[in-house]
């Protein structure tokens, strides 16, 4: 089918159902609002086409070229898009549902408010792409190249990002929830306001990274590195990790409430007014840390090393300190007897 015939059919509201248009030359065509169902469109040339608000349902588009195409609010449902080329394409509000996008190219594409749901993006390229307010849910992004990409207000939920790289990426209030980020390096990135709640960050590297107001609530942080990170007001409530390295980090007024951090290292960290209530800090090292006004009420500090730490008016109410070493304990606030009695009180029948 010639490009002009396809454009005419679409403009008249005809559904392109089951047609074989493989290797079709449709560059710069106008097919906005077109509906394609179970069509064979492998290796078609859609470069610079205007396909805004078009629908591709259960189509085969392997190796298709959409370079520079206008795909604003286009829908791809259960499509085969392996090796498809979307470089420099405009995909604002586009939807990809249950699509195969392995080795697809999205370099420098605009993906503002785009949605990827239950898609396979393994080995794809997002290099230089802009993901603003995009949503990626239940997707596999194994070995994806996202270097120099921008993630602004983007939400990633229950995805596998194993071996994904994002060197030089820019992130602003991005959300990674229940997502596997094992061993991921965030070195050189600015992550202010990003959310990592209930994510698996085992062995992740945040060394020297800006983490202002980041949220790690409920995350797994075994062996993660936060040394020299800057994260005032960061949230680690309910997070858990053994041997986490927070040494020399600047975490003023961060919340570690009910966190599980046995054998963690906070040596030399700035933990001014941090909240560690009900936290597990057994065998942790806080040597030389700034703990002024820190709150350790009901925390477990058994065998913790707090030598040379500044503990001016740090709260130790109800904390377990068996075999803990504290050279500045005299300036801390010990258990308040009246408050302890009130906490043990139960209303009589």
Per-region residue spans from a language model:
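Tandem repeat scaffolds
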Residues: 1-349
């Amino acid at each position: 089918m010639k490009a002009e015939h396809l454009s005419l059919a679409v403009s008249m509201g005809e559904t392109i159902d089951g047609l074989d248009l493989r290797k079709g030359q449709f560059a710069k065509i106008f097919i906005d609002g077109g509906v394609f169902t179970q069509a064979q469109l492998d290796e078609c040339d859609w470069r610079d086409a205007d396909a805004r608000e078009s629908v591709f349902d259960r189509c085969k588009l392997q190796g298709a070229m959409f370079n520079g195409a206008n795909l604003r609010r286009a829908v791809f449902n259960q499509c085969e898009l392996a090796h498809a080329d979307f470089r420099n394409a405009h995909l604002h509000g586009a939807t990809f549902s249950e699509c195969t996008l392995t080795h697809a190219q999205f370099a420098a594409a605009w993906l503002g408010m785009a949605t990827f749901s239950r898609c396979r993006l393994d080995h794809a390229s997002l290099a230089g792409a802009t993901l603003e307010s995009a949503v990626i849910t239940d997707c596999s992004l194994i070995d994806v190249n996202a270097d120099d990409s921008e993630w602004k207000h983007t939400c990633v939920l229950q995805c596998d990002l194993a071996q994904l790289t994002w060197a030089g990426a820019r992130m602003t209030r991005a959300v990674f929830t229940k997502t596997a980020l094992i061993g991921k390096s965030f070195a050189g990135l600015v992550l202010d306001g990003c959310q990592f709640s209930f994510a698996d960050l085992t062995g992740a590297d945040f060394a020297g990274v800006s983490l202002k107001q980041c949220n790690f609530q409920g995350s797994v942080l075994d062996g993660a590195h936060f040394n020299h990170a800057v994260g005032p007001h960061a949230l680690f409530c309910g997070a858990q990790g053994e041997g986490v390295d927070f040494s020399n980090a600047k975490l003023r007024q961060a919340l570690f409430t009910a966190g599980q951090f046995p054998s963690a290292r906070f040596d030399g960290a700035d933990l001014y007014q941090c909240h560690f209530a009900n936290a597990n800090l057994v065998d942790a090292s806080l040597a030389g840390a700034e703990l002024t006004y820190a709150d350790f009420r009901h925390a477990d500090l058994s065998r913790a090393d707090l030598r040379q730490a500044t503990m001016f008016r740090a709260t130790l109410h109800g904390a377990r300190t068996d075999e803990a070493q504290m050279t500045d304990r005299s300036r801390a606030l010990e258990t308040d007897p009246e408050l302890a009695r009130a906490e043990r009180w139960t209303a009589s029948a």
